[in-house]
């Protein structure tokens, strides 16, 4: 029997998750969607695809939880500020949860979700760190784990987005926790994965406003660099940008004692190269979805399989707590101009 799942949130991510579940996850059945945005509700109610698949449309999350008696799981893809409360309500209802990153920008709130999940071991509750499901990043992990580069000690990772001309990023900035929390969170997660969960020791950062001066009202920037020193001598360097001219550009380089692994050194939309009097050139994906569409499908399939086959979820929920601690420390360092330090147990001391 397929897993009955509801998608919460119908913004740019929610719509894509519904489509993925409908056409790329054969063991899942989308039974409902929920959004509080009137325009999204109208769009869903008049969408022939949703009618064809008999997807119920709700504008109230609590009402959906009460009405959908056969519901088994939810995929939370709303704005960050309600991730935790919606996950908690689902857990209390006895539902499995796949929650987009981050669980919350408030560490205590995020920890409450982890605690609730632990109190219900029969439920699968997973954090959505999608890059862990990308074939290239997984191949890099396998090479590192097999000892191909010796002991990894340095990660350099970028998340650079195409310059946003629509105003979406500026509007979203008030709720996303800042550029390091929103933009570098995947890079931080990859660092913990590739370097075997090192404990942070110190964070410092700097940034600038190049295209979106309005971000200053939220204490944020559109370009930033952060460095994390870990206990034991490991280091990570992150570059985040919202102003790239060429497209979505994500690069990760892991250096070890006997070599290095690089992922996506030269971003490209596909394998087409145009050769003319101007030389050789290729196009780049405009945004993250074109780069990670397959990863999101893999993530969904593995979550559904974990539920239906009673397997361990591929990404532990606790991972999100450590990632958020580092992301917030970098954001604090960015705003204060001071180094943020951690003790030997990974707890902040300033």
Where are these regions (language model features)?
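Hydrophobic residues in well-ordered beta-strands that form the structural core
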Residues: 99, 105, 125-127, 156, ...
